[in-house]
Regions:
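N-terminal helix-rich structural modules
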Residues: 1-183
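Short, charged, amphipathic alpha-helical segments
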Residues: 191-196
C-alpha cells in the first residue's frame, strides 16, 4: 500500500525514491562531505513526506546539494541514464511546484502534481462527472473515488484502482492479507465487512464500498479495528479522488474505561468549568469514545 500512496502523490515519486535508495545503499564515495550530508537531508525529507512535496504545505522542496553533484551520485550507482529526466523534476521550481494546486487563476487539475488525472482539464472532469450524477438519487455513490481520469482517443475515461486495473498487483497482495485477517476475525460482522472490502478491491464497485463502510461503522465490540482503502479525498484539488491508507489499532481497555468515566460526568465538568456561569450549558451529554493503540501504519 505504501507505494500506492507514493504514486498517487506524484507519478515521479517512486522513480525518484528508487534512485535515492540506490544511492543510500550503494554509494561508495565520500559520505562525510557537506554535499552528501545535504543529499541525506533531502532523502529524509523525501521519506517523511512520501514524495517530493512537503507533507503539510504541499509545496515542492529541493535538495541543497548542487544538481551536478546529485547527478554524479546517480552515475556512481548506475542510475545515470535517468539523470536528465529525474533531476529536472527534482530541481526545477516550475515542474509540479505543488502537490495539490491552490491557484486562483490557473487550472488546478493541470497544475497539481497528484496522479489522479492525466491529460484532462478541470472543465472536462467536472463535465464528465456531472453527466453521471442523478439529482434524485438519495444514496449516491462517491463518483470517482477510486479511479484515475485520463483521455483516450480524445475521450475522457476512468481507469479504476482495483485488482486487474491500476495498482492491481499491490491490491492483490492486500486482498490476500485481508483474507487471512477474515479467517481470524473477532466477530461475524467484522468477517463480513472484511469480505466486502476484498470484493470491493476486486471489482472496484463503489456500492460495495458503501456496504463495507456500513458494516465497519456498526462493528463496535471488537478489540481490533482498522482503516483500509481509498478513503480521504483532501489530496485531490477537486475533492473527489481518495488516497490509499492502511492502519490497524487495538483498543486500550483501561484507558477506554477512564474515558467512559469522563464522558459519564460531562455535566459535572460543564458545571465546574472555569468560565463565566453565563456561558455554561445547562444540559450536556458525553460522547461515545474509546482509546486505541496503533499497531501498524
Amino acid at each position: 500500500g505504501r507505494d500506492i500512496t507514493w504514486d498517487q502523490y506524484c507519478k515521479w515519486n517512486l522513480p525518484i525514491r528508487h534512485v535515492v535508495e540506490d544511492i543510500l545503499n550503494e554509494y561508495e564515495g565520500d559520505r562525510e562531505c557537506a554535499d552528501f550530508q545535504n543529499f541525506t537531508v533531502y532523502a529524509k525529507r523525501l521519506f517523511f513526506a512520501n514524495g517530493i512535496h512537503h507533507h503539510y504545505s504541499e509545496d515542492k522542496f529541493f535538495p541543497e546539494c548542487p544538481k551536478e553533484y546529485f547527478q554524479s551520485l546517480m552515475e556512481a550507482v548506475g542510475d545515470g541514464e535517468q539523470a536528465t529526466e529525474l533531476l529536472e523534476v527534482i530541481y526545477s521550481p516550475d515542474i509540479y511546484p505543488q502537490r495539490r494546486s491552490t491557484s486562483k487563476t490557473g487550472d488546478i487539475v493541470e497544475l497539481s502534481a497528484v496522479n489522479f488525472y492525466d491529460g484532462v482539464t478541470r472543465e472536462e472532469v467536472d463535465k464528465y462527472y456531472n453527466s453521471m450524477m442523478d439529482p434524485n438519487d438519495k444514496t449516491p455513490i462517491s463518483y470517482g473515488l477510486n479511479t484515475k481520469v485520463v483521455k483516450e482517443d480524445g475521450k475522457v475515461v476512468e481507469k479504476p484502482w482495483k485488482v486487474g486495473g491500476i495498482y492491481g498487483p499491490a491490491l492483490e497482495k492486500i486482498c490476500a492479507e485481508l483474507e487471512k485477517a477474515a479467517a481470524v476475525a473477532e466477530t461475524d460482522l467484522q468477517k463480513e465487512a472484511i469480505g466486502k472490502l476484498v470484493e470491493y478491491y476486486r471489482t472496484g464497485d463503489l456500492k460495495t464500498w458503501d456496504d463495507f463502510n456500513i458494516d465497519w461503522v456498526q462493528d463496535t465490540v471488537g478489540t481490533i479495528d482498522f482503516i483500509n482503502g481509498f478513503i480521504e479525498d483532501y489530496d485531490d484539488p477537486l475533492g473527489r479522488k481518495a488516497t490509499w491508507e492502511g492502519y490497524v489499532n487495538m483498543k486500550d481497555s483501561a484507558a477506554s474505561a477512564r474515558t467512559e468515566v469522563l464522558s459519564a460526568n460531562a455535566q459535572w465538568f460543564e458545571d465546574n468549568s472555569p468560565v463565566d456561569p453565563r456561558f455554561r450549558k445547562p444540559h450536556v451529554k458525553g460522547v461515545s469514545a474509546k482509546v486505541v493503540d496503533g499497531i501498524t501504519l
